[in-house]
Curated annotation (Swiss-Prot):
This protein's name: Malate dehydrogenase
Keywords per UniProt: NAD, Oxidoreductase, Tricarboxylic acid cycle
Keyword NAD: yes
Gene: mdh
Positions annotated to bind substrate: R86, R92, N124, R155
Amino acid sequence: MAKSSKVSIVGAGGNVGSIVAYSVAMQGLAHEVILVDRDKDRAQGKALDMNQAAAAMRTHSIVRAANDYTDIEGSKVVVITAGFPRKPGMSRDDLLFANADIVSEVVENVVKHAPDSIIIVVTNPLDTMTYVALKKSGFPKNRVIGMAGILDGARMTHFIYEKLGFGAGQIRATVIGGHGDYMVPLPRYSTVAGIPITDLLTPQELQEVVEATKNGGAQIVKLMGTSAYFAPGKATAIMVEAILQDSKKIYPCSTLLEGEYGVHGIPNGVPVTLGANGVEEIIELQLTPREREEFQRSVDSVKELIDVLENQNYFGEK
């Protein structure tokens, strides 16, 4: 266990935040799990429910609802899930200014009360909110990370299984790029028990998997009337686990690129090693010209949103 095994989830009253907290507590990843939410009664109710579940599981995790932001002091990881959810027909981009304000407010309190923490951003539009958290916190880039590719890779893994009908638990899928319409699924870097997926599926089947992956979140919104939460919550908990256990495992995450992949000053999803210091290394994949072009489109889509904020002097810079 990490020396500081305290994790705080801001927006824990929501579905994704609740799943993150529940996963962390049930696995006993942290001794303290702090639920921060504007609806304090809801947070207290969820904390009580989770503590009883932890007792049944006989884990040592203690879940507490925060009275205010002072309760996040000493956190090793702060997860930001707070924000307005997507509704049917709403793009992630529609959420831009509303959620930027929420993330800015949260980050201001993180800087004040947990200045040594690692921030994991889950709020959409993901890559842009990661940039907002970076700018507003002033933290080094390794300590502000966006949750993206683990979720998208999990969706791709599921759709590969649907095509194959075998290999459940043995499929490893790789998705880079922004967490949105311009994500870049990479069949070349996806395998089943070490066998390249390109050897098992036809080009047409692969294209169908790619399209299903890109539309995976929207499909759930259409069916449920709200965003997914089980898979995003679990994907975030996997990141928390890697940081607390200093595992150095490789996961695709949104991180600020400063020359890697030919990109400067824009966060985007790429494979990284996650450990006690957050992002400890960025892994540069050898992309084909077509993959690089798709990745650049993803970067450009994030830059467009960042430019919208900067053109409104959102970060107070001249």
